[in-house]
Amino acid sequence: MLERKKTLNVFRDARDAYGSYDDFPVGQPGVDPMPHLSRNRMAQPFFQVSEADQVLIQMAGRGEIEFRDARMTLEPGDTIYIPACTPSRLHPHGEVVQLRLKAEPAVREAVAFYCACGAIVASTEVAAGIVQDAYLAAVHAFNASARTCTCGAVHPLVELGDTAWDRVAAALR
């Protein structure tokens, strides 16, 4: 089971990840920025937006990070600065291990679902705190909605894949 500690062995601890996009805080409370560990195997279900800058470190595996108007390839060792309020979405090519450095104390985030035309189909603001509950609620709300863009495109249901946000949130309480 993942836990907060003073030292971190990323590769050993990643084996204990609950599922994709855990964003499990692995540092001691009060560490700023706080490292959040994820082992991802599927495309991120939404674009993630934070009101504070973040840094993403690609520890293992390959993939891409998608911004609104660009994509970048991610290779082991890559470090990506994500400016505040910049929507980004991760697309692993197989299994990846990533550390995301987030502000501590936590700040507001949002999740957004975009259409290929560029319009926002839906978005949800996420209060600071245990964000995994809000991630899960946002996907359920999106799936329960009409999922129709202003351009007329109807978006498919979002698959949760191997995410385990309910278990991560329970572990953080």
PLM region spans:
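Conserved metal-binding segment of the jelly-roll/cupin
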Residues: 74-94, 103
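Cys/His-enriched microdomains
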Residues: 56, 110-115, 146-149
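A short beta-strand-loop-beta hairpin characteristic of the jelly-roll/cupin
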Residues: 49-78
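Short solvent-exposed loop/turn micro-motifs enriched in small/polar/acidic residues
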Residues: 19, 41, 48-50, 73, ...
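A short hydrophobic beta-strand segment most commonly corresponding to one strand
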Residues: 93-112
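Flexible, surface-exposed loop/linker segments and immediately adjacent secondary-structure boundaries
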Residues: 110-121, 128-131
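Short functional micro-motifs and their immediate structural scaffolds
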Residues: 120-126, 154-157
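A short, N-terminal "cap"/entry segment at the start of jelly-roll beta-barrel domains
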Residues: 1-39, 43-46, 137-173
